[in-house]
Each structure stands twice: as structure tokens, then as C-alpha cells.
Curated annotation (Swiss-Prot):
4'-phosphopantetheine is transferred from CoA to a specific serine of apo-ACP by AcpS. This modification is essential for activity because fatty acids are bound in thioester linkage to the sulfhydryl of the prosthetic group. The modification O-(pantetheine 4'-phosphoryl)serine is found at residue 37. NCBIfam families: acyl_carrier, PRK00982.1-2, PRK00982.1-3, PRK00982.1-4, PRK00982.1-5. One of its GO terms (molecular function) is acyl binding. Keywords: Cytoplasm, Fatty acid biosynthesis, Fatty acid metabolism, Lipid biosynthesis, Lipid metabolism, Phosphopantetheine, Phosphoprotein. The gene is acpP. Residues 2-77 form the Carrier domain. SMART domains: PKS_PP (SM00823). This is Acyl carrier protein. The lineage of its organism: Bacteria, Pseudomonadati, Pseudomonadota, Gammaproteobacteria, Thiotrichales. One of its GO terms (biological process) is lipid A biosynthetic process.
Amino acid sequence: MSDIEQRVKNVVVEQLGVDEAEVTNAASFVDDLGADSLDTVELVMALEEEFGTEIPDEEAEKITTVQLAIDYVKSHQ
């Protein structure tokens, strides 16, 4: 597991209060991890802070799974 992947998963665990075992790469924030719209906004803000990057709203809407978050961060580092 890459450093970025682990950091993304740590942010997800912290923000959504879920067990680390539930945070698989294919996990959907809403369908699998029980996030609501406010949770997803806060999750994006936490990812921005963790990685020092800005995620525009139109991009944030597309980040619906753990893997998509990892891919976004990797391509914008």
C-alpha cells in the first residue's frame, strides 16, 4: 500500500468514524460507509488539508469511492 493510499484511508476513517477494515479501495463513501452529503463535504476538506491541494467542487462531486480519492490525490501532487 502506498503512502498516499494509507493517508487517504486514515482521513476516511477519521472523518467518517468507520472501522479501518471497512475502508477498502472499492468502498463507496455513501453506499458502503454511510456518509451523507455533509460528511462528503467534510471529507473533501480534510483531504485538501492533508495533501495541501484544492479540490474544485465539480471534481469533488466525482470522488465517490476510496479509490477515486486516491487516484485524484496521486494525479494532483
